[in-house]
Amino acid sequence: MNKTAIALLALLASSASLAATPWQKITQPVPGSAQSIGSFSNGCIVGADTLPIQSEHYQVMRTDQRRYFGHPDLVMFIQRLSSQVSNLGMGTVLIGDMGMPAGGRFNGGHASHQTGLDVDIFLQLPKTRWTSAQLLRPQALDLVSRDGKHVVSTLWKPEIFSLIKLAAQDKDVTRIFVNPAIKQQLCLDAGTDRDWLRKVRPWFQHRAHMHVRLRCPADSLECEDQPLPPSGDGCGAELQSWFEPPKPGTTKPEKKTPPPLPPSCQALLDEHVI
């Protein structure tokens, strides 16, 4: 097979992988009382709220992607956190992806963010508000060294520590995903007040942002919560295991076929997508 044919096949495969999912055809929230349905990586939402684009405390990035929808609890969390940050004079909170109008699967970039309870927040707090052009094409600030073993000391700021801690202390937050090197730095900086560290979980990538996840709302009866994180601050052997080389013979897990949708989410698709 010649190179042109190989390139064409690669392009077609790439295009297929980025093909729009049915959820992207739903352009407005589904009317009804707010209900997060299913799990974070296989679910949907009825009655999502739209995060107001204009705020003196935060700015929303990539608004052209229209990923600023979520459960009312998520919208209130963002407003609550950004107000705290502003009152402390720390800067402007930069909001990344939340979810789509009815939640559901993205065509790439996220496995979760499906039930309106997840949000990505940049780990930088500009003192000067970003321009429209900067918000549409945001420049992420990679806080982790090339070898992945520690944060870049010249980029790590006390304000970023405080931002993550404030988010983790929020009553509605159940998990915050950050790079292992960032978790390690939080462990070093935390001092004796360490209870909140339990919620901060090391995960792949997440070098420039934190992924905040809320607990299932009490009245979302079909929402599936994760088990609570292990007890303790998570700064011991589990964290160190992230820095160890992979064991010989370790291979990447095969990509799994997505599980069936929860019945309520399938019914929502059947009703709202032609």
From Swiss-Prot:
Role, per record: Murein endopeptidase that cleaves the D-alanyl-meso-2,6-diamino-pimelyl amide bond that connects peptidoglycan strands. Likely plays a role in the removal of murein from the sacculus and could also play a role in the integration of nascent murein strands into the sacculus.
One GO cellular component, as annotated: outer membrane-bounded periplasmic space
ATP-binding keyword on record: no
Signal sequence extent: 1-19
Outcome following mutation: D120A: Strongly reduces enzyme activity
E.C. numbers: 3.4.24.-
Subunit structure: Dimer.
Binding site for Zn(2+) 1: H110, H113, D120, H211
Chain residue ranges for the region called Disordered: 228-274
Main location: periplasm
Regulation: Inhibited by Zn(2+) at 10 mM and by metal chelating agents EDTA and 1,10-phenanthroline.
Further facts: In E.coli there are three murein endopeptidases: two are penicillin sensitive (DacB and PbpG), the other (MepA) not.
Gene source species: Escherichia coli (strain K12)
Entry similarity comment: Belongs to the peptidase M74 family.
Gene: mepA
Protein name (database record): Penicillin-insensitive murein endopeptidase
Family matches, as Pfam families: Peptidase_M74
InterPro entries registered for this protein in UniProt: Hedgehog_sig/DD-Pept_Zn-bd_sf (IPR009045), Peptidase_M74 (IPR005073)
Superkingdom classification of source: Bacteria
Compartments, record wording: Periplasm
